[in-house]
Amino acid sequence: MSNIVVCVQNEDQKVTAKQTIDAIYKAGFKNVFVQYYHRETKGLDELEQIDYCRKLGLNIIFCHLGYKNSRDINSIWLEGETGEKVIDGFIEDFKMLKERQIELVVMHLVSGKEPPIHNEIGLNRIKRLVKHAKEIGIKIALENTRQHIYVEYILENIKDKNLGLCFDSGHYHCFSKDKFNYSLFKNRIFAIHLHDNDKISDLHLLPFDGTI
């Protein structure tokens, strides 16, 4: 049976991550995912959030890695040290998360409306990332975002059981207009982000509150 997983949202200015985790626990949910964005948070930092979830007996199904601000994911497609440092940062994340028994991470390949064109520079960097993840026993799920061509490009060119897809239903609806290459991805789906929208904006509505 599939696990229903609730996000530990850690960027709310009025509600702390601890309050969010407590609310999830009191509501009776058993599974969560934690945003591991290296973001300054009120109260518990991101690693402490993982520890607190475990203290309450919550299962952490995966961690979602950061992709913007100090970690500009678009740079992985460009020549230069910045892209290499981004990959190095992810590798360090893997080590820290593996120490806390996290076995699945979700990540984006691009950010924004006009990312660089997909190319072998980015492909080779993701190959390096997958190699390190496999060595320590972590699986990577790539999320379909505004331009799903990047996920298709990487998964077509890296045939590895440790690399798969986090299918985002909302992005599929409003960005891809319900068009997706299921034949390529159907056996490589590691996680699903389930939310709804009006097919125009990425609203993150509850299922059935939109037009999917």
Map each language-model feature to its residues.
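Active-site acidic/histidine proton-transfer and metal-coordination neighborhood
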Residues: 72-164
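Charged helix-capping and loop-helix junction motifs
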Residues: 44-50, 83, 87-88, 119-127, ...
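Acidic/histidine-rich catalytic cores of soluble enzymes
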Residues: 32, 63, 127-211
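Short secondary-structure boundary segments
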Residues: 36, 109, 196
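Residue-level detection of beta-strand scaffold positions
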Residues: 21, 57-58, 94, 138, ...
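N-terminal pre-domain/capping segments
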Residues: 1-88, 98, 160
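Acidic-and-aromatic substrate-binding clefts and catalytic sites of carbohydrate-active enzymes
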Residues: 8-17, 34-48, 70-71, 112-117, ...
